[in-house]
From Swiss-Prot:
This is Serine--tRNA ligase. The keyword Electron transport does not apply. One of its GO terms (biological process) is seryl-tRNA aminoacylation. HAMAP family: Ser_tRNA_synth_type1. ATP binds at R264, A265, E266, E351, I352, S353, S354. It is found in: Cytoplasm. It catalyses: tRNA(Ser) + L-serine + ATP = L-seryl-tRNA(Ser) + AMP + diphosphate + H(+); tRNA(Sec) + L-serine + ATP = L-seryl-tRNA(Sec) + AMP + diphosphate + H(+). The gene is serS. CDD domains: SerRS_core. Its EC number is 6.1.1.11. Homodimer. The tRNA molecule binds across the dimer. One of its GO terms (cellular component) is cytoplasm. Consists of two distinct domains, a catalytic core and a N-terminal extension that is involved in tRNA binding. L-serine binds at T233, A234, E235, E287, S387.
Length: 426
């Protein structure tokens, strides 16, 4: 959520920023919220004037009674004042709800360093690590490798649940579990994050706090009859751990790493990368979440991105980092990096992590603040998160980049201690 004061003071600037994002944004929302804000402030002034008049008349009643004079006229006037105040209170509540409705639908303001552009083709490559894997034999896609090795069962996943669900079997399941533990160990032991195991269902307030609702409700799995949502990422429960709280500045930055299953309807992605493990309705992920002081947030974003990169370096998987352009930035981020791993079957890099600084956008929605040294006026915190990284896509990348001509797959050395020193899947 943006600062309403900034919109009030610079409505035309905000309109231009929204148009430059490349999204289909209705600038009338800005005009409407400015008008509602003006009406809100008018109501507050009028209510204060009415209350002042009522207090003045209330003090006169005592004097009139002492003097034995008639108070009926002034009592009637006070009743009218009270009725008018109640009417304004009702209108104020209505105006506040309308303001909230609009504010929840206005996207974040991009950082000045976000490049111009409309699609992912306009994203800017920042750096690469490793070289794309080359083979001297005809390589296979991970869905064929997994099926041939009998470690991934797409057919039975479809029978059990439907398209874009997968059953991991035998060494496939063990590989997934090994990756989860490797990622968590690196982030907690080497990078200093505190591990969190969060609920996989959250309420509407939590989904609203991190920005999934109301805009992306069609992409969420909702549990009917009780208002719960299956989490699309551990970002949601971990960020909302601190909803409506005031943190101590001495405790910042707070760094959490959370493994969870993730659930996404992906309503707008029909036909996109739907084979294999790249785009599933249910998948596992280790998420990194930070709560930091505003002046530290962009340094912390660089550190978070490096932390996510480290797990790919440890696995020897070639990747690149791109800075996301305005049109591809999404609703909540002020600046975002994507980490893309090399996938031979696609002959291109594929997103495996997004690392974002939301500045105070989520904190305003979730009302997360801090006090410097635990004292003074509370200020909104900055929140950051990033995938550290997606597990299923890591499995896919390992199967494709570490495949051998005989159909086996070499297990990356870093994972072998988690797989009882097994070195090959065959």
């Amino acid at each position: 959520m943006l600062d309403l004061k900034r919109i009030r003071n610079n409505p035309e600037e905000i309109k231009q920023i929204m148009q430059n994002r490349g999204e289909d944004f209705d600038n009338k929302l800005i005009d409407d919220v400015v008008a509602l804000d003006e009406r809100r402030r008018q109501i507050l002034v009028e209510v204060e004037q009415l209350k002042s008049k009522r207090n003045s008349e209330s003090s006169q009643i005592g004097k009139l009674k002492k003097e034995g004079k008639d108070t009926s006229a002034i009592m009637a006037d006070m009743k009218k004042l009270s009725d008018d105040i109640k009417a304004f209170d009702v209108e104020l509540n209505e105006v506040d709800e309308k303001i909230k409705y609009i504010m929840l639908r206005i996207p974040n303001i991009p950082n000045p360093n976000v490049p111009d552009g409309e699609t992912d083709e306009d994203n800017i490559e920042i750096r690469k690590w490793g070289e794309p894997t080359k083979f001297d034999f005809e390589s296979k896609a991970h869905w064929d490798i997994g099926t041939d090795l009998d470690i991934l069962d797409f057919e039975r996943g479809g029978k059990i649940a439907g398209s874009r669900f997968t059953v991991y079997k035998g060494l496939g399941a063990r590989l997934e579990r090994a990756i989860i533990n490797y990622f968590l160990d690196m982030h907690t032991i080497d990078h200093g994050y505190t591990e969190i195991l969060p609920p996989y269902m959250v309420n509407r307030d939590s989904m609203t706090g991190t920005g999934q609702l109301p805009k992306f409700e069609e992409d969420a799995f909702k549990v009917e009859n009780n208002g719960y949502f299956l989490i699309p990422t551990a970002e949601v429960p971990v960020t909302n751990m601190y909803r409506n709280e005031i943190l101590n500045g001495d405790d910042l930055p707070i760094k959490h790493a959370a493994y969870s299953a993730c659930f996404r309807a992906e309503a707008g992605s029909a036909g996109r990368d739907t084979r294999g493990l790249v785009r599933q309705h249910q998948f596992n992920k280790v998420e990194l979440v930070k709560f930091v002081k505003p002046e530290q947030s962009y340094d912390e974003l660089e550190k978070l991105t490096n932390d996510a990169e480290d797990v790919l370096k440890g696995l020897g998987l070639p990747y690149r980092v791109v800075r996301i352009c305005k049109g591809d930035l999404g609703f909540t981020a002020a600046l975002k990096y994507d980490i893309e791993v090399w996938m031979p079957s696609y002959n291109r890099y594929v997103e495996i992590s997004s690392c974002s600084n939301f500045e105070d956008f989520q904190a305003r929605r979730a009302n997360i603040r801090y006090k410097e040294n635990g004292k003074g006026k509370p200020e909104f915190i900055h929140t950051l998160n990033g995938s550290g990284v997606a597990i299923g896509r890591t499995v896919a990348a390992i199967l494709e980049n570490y495949q051998n001509e005989d159909g086996t797959v070499t297990i990356p050395e870093a994972l072998r201690p988690y797989m009882r020193n097994l070195d090959v899947i065959k």
